[in-house]
Amino acid sequence: TSGRNYAFKESKSYEPIPLTGVIKRSDSELISLSENFLNKMKLRHTIRDFSKRDVPYEVIENCIRVAGLAPSGANRQPWHFSIVSNPVVKLQIRNAAEREEKKFYNDIKKDAWLRALEPFGTHAHKPHLEEAPWLIVAFAERYEKNSDGHKQKNYYVPESVGIAIGFLISAIHFTGLHCLIHTPSPM
């Protein structure tokens, strides 16, 4: 070890939350459940063409609730999700995203990256941002206000948000829907 000794104060406010609802399973049940999950996830893929089918708001809300169950640095849950269905707002998001995408696709320094994307047929035009019945916009929260109103840092923000989005994608998939992650930089 480094020879350093760290002394941690025992928290007087710490109260462990008992884990309830645990079902003890046999090895064969565990294997079966893991195989079922694997087979379900093998069917997951992104799409760029969305149907006009209405999806109830409650479905999207429940998927976001699943994302909210993701583990996070210091259990801060440093994310915020916004649900967008308003056509005017979706058009504004599309226009802003396409402006950024045009810069990306015209940047000669990104030639290798663009060649890697070529088999997927991606381009600067993002009609799916208007066509999808819902857009879910994820925001990372690097800081939050504590109970005294002071700014306090959140920890492992990119990792925590990434895990939450992974939960969200899985929830969307398990409802029978599909999604596409879109990450225009610097949006």
Residue map of PLM features:
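N-terminal accessory segments that position/regulate proteins before the catalytic core
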Residues: 1-62, 92-95, 103-106
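Glycine/small-residue-rich phosphate/adenosyl-binding loop
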Residues: 10, 80-162
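Small-aliphatic-rich amphipathic alpha-helix that forms the alpha element of a beta-alpha
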Residues: 44, 63-68, 136, 142-187
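Short catalytic-loop micro-motif centered on adjacent basic/acidic residues
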Residues: 49-51, 80, 178-182
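Short beta->alpha junction loops/turns
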Residues: 53, 82, 86, 184-186
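Glycine-rich phosphate/pyrophosphate-binding beta-alpha loops
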Residues: 68-75
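Short gly/pro-enriched beta-turn/loop segments at secondary-structure junctions
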Residues: 76-77, 129-132, 172-175
